Structures are given as C-alpha cells and as structure tokens.
Amino acid sequence: MHPPAVSLTRFLRHSIAALLLTLAGNCGIVQAQQKTAPAQEKPKIRAITAFINLDRAQYQQQVADALKMLKRAQTVFESRGYEVQTIRISTQPFPEYTKGLTKEQAVEFFKQYDALAAKEKFAAAIGPAMLNAGDSEAQADLLAEILGNTKTLNASLVVAGEDGVHWAAVGAAARVMKKLEESTPHSQGNFSFSAIAMVPPLTPFYPGSYHTGFGHQFTIALESANVVAAAFKGAPDLSTAKQRLTDSLAASAFDIERLAGRVDQDTGWAYMGIDLSPAPLKDVSIGAAIENLTTQPFGTSGTLTAAATITAAIKDVKVKQAGYSGLMLPILEDSRLAQRWSEGRISIDALLSYSAVCGTGLDTVPLPGDITAEQLSLIIGDMASLAYKWHKPLSARLLPALGKGWGEMTEFDNSFLVNATLQPLDRK
C-alpha cells in the first residue's frame, strides 16, 4: 500500500528542513573551530643534505652526481611550495681520505674543494677530525689549519660516543676553537666548527654533519620556528600547545617525506629521514615562540617546561626522524635569544639544564675573547658528560670573540648571526 501523496510531500519537506538545520549547525561548528585553531604555518626546508664517500681521485664527479640529485630534490620541494634555503654535501671523516698527504697537501686539497663548493653554491662538511677515542690529535691541529684557510667548509670533533667521553678530543676541540678565534676574520671560523657528542651519522644540520657508510644517501632539515610560534599562540594549556605543535609539524612532515620518497625513487639516492628540530633564523625566533607559551621572558621559570613540551611534540611525529630532532637554542642565530642573552637572562648552565630535556646543547654561544683553552674544555666536557649520561645528541659551537670582554658587543659579520652583549663566564 502506497502512502498518500500529501503525506509523502510533508515527509520530504520535514526531512529536507532537518537536513538543512543539521548542515547549518555543522557549518557553525567548523567556523568556530577555524576561529580558535591557529592558522597552518608552513616550514621552510633549511637544508637538503647529500652524503658521499669522498674519493680524492674522483671527487669532482661525485660532487656533480650529488648536485644532480640535490637540484632534482630542490625542484620537487619548491613545486609544492617549500622554500629550500641550502643544498649541502657531507662526507665521511676527512682523515679517511687524506691519508698519505702532508699537512700542506691536505690544506691545498681542501682549498680546491672549498673553491668548488663556492662555485657550485653548495655548503660542505668534511666530517670529524677525531671520530673515535684514541684518534690522533694531530688531525685536530690539521683541521684548524683547514678551516682557517677556507670559507665554506664545516667540520667537527666527536667528544663523546657509546664508549663514554673522549677527553683527549675535548681538549683538542678547545684548542681548535682558540686557534680559529685568533686566526679568522672577526673570529668567525668557529661558526663552522663544533664539538659533537652522541650525534648520529646522517644529521643534515651543520657543522656536525657526517656519515660512516657508503654514502649515496640524503636527509632533510627544517626551519620551523614559525610553526612553533603559531601552535603556541593563544594555547590555553600545555597539552593543547603540544598537540597543536605535533599536528602542525606532522602535516608538513608527512608531505615532505612523501616527496622525499619520490626523489629516492627518481634518483636512486636513499632517503634516510628528516630532522624535525625547529631551527630558527634571526627574527623567525624560537625564543619568541617559547615566550608565546610561557608569556614570560625566555630564561625565567617555565622555560624548561616549554622546552620539554616542544621536544615531546617532535618525538610524537610519526615520520622517519634523523639527526637531533629536538629543540635548538642557537643564541646568535635567534634575535630573541640574543636579546635575552644580552640582558643576562640566559647562561651556559641554564642552556645545559634545558639540554637535559631537549637539545642541541650549546649553539652559537658568544664568549669573551680572553677565555682560555682550559676554560673552553671545561664547558665542552660538561656538554659531553650530559650527552653521554642521557644518551642524547648534543654539541658545543662556542664563539669566543677576540679582543672583546664582558659587557662589550660582539662584531660578527655573518648574515646568519645576530650580535649580542658578552656576559661574564661566572655570574655571581
């Protein structure tokens, strides 16, 4: 038996009206969420880093092959709206491919490699001078000569590994820092050098980047302090802030990983992961992002909790992670951090305490020029001990400024650095 036409018409009219009311209600919910949720920020790609097993007899062809992949990757990422800031090539530890050379011959080779990097517009890392405990300290002395005579090269010393702190390397790293302070313009050679502890191979960030395998691999580094700032702005509590940050980073990281997989398939270079550390750059400030959450100046109570929140959010992003993948606090690469350092709100001990819950240690920290190698080794040793104790990647990139004392302003002439007022080593 069929329902009367009038009843059917009334039924349809009521059903359509109910559907319209439901849609209108849902529309209101969506609009409300759009008002409360932070706008989606897109990170930049700080670096696409290729890893090669450098052979002096054919390094030019190896570099050409790596650049072909890097430029293909750059095109892929830029087509999706990601700004790629640098392309980079890192090698195995340089003592492995300079065996048999005199100091003068090694320096001359790296001058040629430096010129190639400048010509082809890629950043270059030549790996650690000392990788294992017991490695020759003469290689650290050679490294100081290499960095003092080149402009684009980056390198490191490993001062802690699975076997503990490498105390000879700690002292050697301090001597390299003093040599670079005294022998490079504006003492800027130390910007390209770091003492690294528990830092795994294949990190894309410089200067501690290296590998120990066959190469033909690549990783990606982000510049995403803007993503942190947007996620934290107006967050009502830590839990919300953390979830917002995880979701925001994941949205881009999944997309970047998918694109990296395409590069892997297209080129045959193996994609080894992404370093999600939210690197800042001057006014794109991680310090300001943290202040969005704490509503207090960086360095006051609550800063450590914010640092832990960022690191926890990063660890929850389910992509293939590489390198540090933790919070970076590079004092002179971040305008707000440089300001708070100048105000005396941040100290080396405070940075080490934050490193206990995040990373990456002591990065671009300005120091008075009269600091001794012994004092530098104590600072590096503290960082290395912390890294080994908690089995986490940390580094020390310390920037003593020749001829400058506490209370004076640094005069670094580098587009990546912000100058700041030097603070005393021991604050009372």
Where do the PLM segments sit?
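Bacterial N-terminal signal peptides that target proteins for export
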Residues: M1-I16
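Bacterial N-terminal signal peptides
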Residues: S15-N26
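Sec/Tat signal peptide C-region and signal peptidase I cleavage site
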Residues: G28-Q31
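Anaerobic metallocofactor- and corrinoid-dependent redox/one-carbon enzyme cores
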Residues: Q33-K428
